[in-house]
Amino acid sequence: LFYLCHELRHAQQYLHPQQFEQAVVESLPYVILYNGTCFKLCGKEWKGCVLPGSEEYFSDVYLSLPYELDANAYAYRTVKFLLGESEALDKLYSMWLPKKRISAEEYRKLFEQVDVATEG
């Protein structure tokens, strides 16, 4: 149920971006995976690149993406509302929190790198 709610939240983010904080909206065109593989939505096409860095760093980057933090928090709140308090739910939610949060400034720099790497 957690993952269903998480993915439904992503659908809501893309369909109704005006309902979300600016940080979520600005991050939506970007996908940054655990291994540094990145994608940017350019019109209707996804363009890819790979940025250098460790898997540990990019795991935190992925987990700190504003749209991921929002989707995980939404899934947690929704499941908790529907099924009540649960140690298993708390543990699952904790698993999807970054060890080190990435700052908005660092995201701006990363998104700029992806922009440059996916041009042309």
Model regions and ranges:
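Short pre-active-site segment immediately N-terminal to the catalytic Zn-binding motif
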Residues: L1-L4
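Catalytic Zn2+-binding segment of zinc metalloproteases
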Residues: E7-E26
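Metalloprotease/metallohydrolase-associated module, dominated by Zn2+-dependent proteases
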Residues: V25-E119
